[in-house]
């Protein structure tokens, strides 16, 4: 009985959501990830993200493999190129240190993919904290919470901009 309880506890730990990783170019998608950095689910937030996912089933895949596959699909489908070369990586985790570590790891992974494809890309990264306001904006505009957070930061610096005008833009266009 003791071993059975331990087995169930270990299974739950390996299959519980530990982090949420969001990737935004103009395709916006989100991945829930276990503490062992396995993808539990992938949610596309717009049609472009559905194109990127295609028929890929990334559930159970190592996070690095999933990120490589998604970046590869973005390159192949023209969402990332020499002209459109910025990607936003957002990480949400209750543990700030783990969030920062995962954010840096993913930035390094994506930079390696860019270098392998001879692409001069820009990886913007941030840690986000879930809030009802951000969730509502993300849902309203069909974007990730990470992109909603970036847009709020841009608007805070330039009050002449509006959320509605920035939401449909690519990360590359927002970063300019």
What are these regions (language model features)?
Residues 1-17:
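Single-pass transmembrane signal-anchor helices and their membrane-water interface zones
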Residues 12-176:
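Polar, acidic low-complexity tracts enriched in Ser/Thr/Gln/Glu with frequent Gly/Pro and Thr-Pro motifs
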